[in-house]
Amino acid sequence: MRSERGLSVAENKDTGFRVITSVIKPAFKMHFSPTIIGSENIPKDGAVVIAGNHKNISDQFLVFLATKRVVNYMAKREYFDGALAPLFKWAGCIPVNRDGFDAAAVRRAIKILKRGGAVGIFPEGTRNRTDKSLLAFKPGAAAIAKRGGALIVPFAISGEYRKNGNLKILFGEPFSPESMSVEEATDKLYSAVSDLLNSQ
């Protein structure tokens, strides 16, 4: 399958994995020194949506520290036009137009899942710049997981985004949204992420 940027999903995965393992992972580990808890909850294979809170542009790359799997993150299209564009492209991120429903991005995410891949989604839909621990969740993560036949693994990032900032990345137990409505699965995901944040 060809992506809209001219690279196949497989090519994006291979390139992104090499870049992240050789450069980004060591740099992020040294700069943030995060504590990773519950990474064993991420399935080693099979379709999975990894979804959690979003406060910093580094979040999707921090999640890469916790898993050897390639996670194709859904990211706003503007990132693909700026200085960080090569990083997002090489990592196999999926560009999303947030002005409305982006059917092409959803189809691409579902195809990745149906091939047994992993997709990362921030269900808040944007970075949380408020004093609230979480913004309301949009239904996209649950809907994509259901249509892609995927498990959902909740995660939470807490602490300060700096060295010695006690940054933690926590993963909860996976659950299947198959027998749930999209609304029920979204509520369960929100509760799981909230519980992870409150556990710290």
Sequence positions of predicted segments:
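A transmembrane-helix-recognition feature enriched in membrane-embedded lipid enzymes
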Residues: 2-38, 82-91
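Non-catalytic C-terminal accessory region of glycerolipid acyltransferases
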Residues: 2-15, 104-200
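Catalytic core of membrane glycerolipid acyltransferases/transacylases, capturing the structured
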Residues: 22, 29, 43-100
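A generic structural signal for well-ordered alpha-helical segments
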Residues: 27-29, 66, 88, 112, ...
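A conditional alpha-helix N-cap/helix-loop micro-motif detector
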Residues: 32, 99-103, 134
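Small-molecule pocket liners
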Residues: 32, 71, 167
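Short acidic-hydrophobic, aromatic-tinged amphipathic segments that line or gate anion-handling sites
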Residues: 36-37, 94-97, 177
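Short amphipathic alpha-helix with an adjacent loop that forms part of the alpha/beta core around
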Residues: 40-42, 110-111
